[in-house]
Curated annotation (Swiss-Prot):
This is Beta-defensin 39. One of its GO terms (biological process) is defense response to bacterium. InterPro entries: Defensin_beta-like (IPR001855). The keyword Isomerase does not apply. SUPFAM superfamilies: Defensin-like. Only expressed in epididymis (caput, corpus and cauda). It comes from the Eukaryota. Disulfide bonds join C29-C58, C36-C51, C41-C59. Has antibacterial activity.
Length: 74
């Protein structure tokens, strides 16, 4: 009985070491300080690539372009 508990413990610890973010595209996305989403990017972020072995989307914060009115030359 003790052996079965020990084997169950070893199996659960071994399976917890599997990394779901092991894809190369995910690593590149996180290195550029972007985020990965499985569905769609939030409305304030733009999709720039893939994550999770092309099953998700790599999202980057959208840059807001604010136009400053220029003074007219007289």
């Amino acid at each position: 009985m003790k052996i079965s508990y020990f084997l169950l413990l070893i199996l659960s610890l071994g399976s917890s070491q599997i990394n779901p973010v092991s894809g190369d595209d995910s690593i590149q996305c996180f290195q550029k300080n972007n985020t990965c989403h499985t569905n769609q990017c939030p409305y304030f972020q733009d999709e720039i690539g893939t994550c999770y072995d092309k099953r998700g989307k790599c999202c980057q914060k959208r840059l807001l372009h604010i136009r400053v009115p220029r003074k007219k030359k007289v």
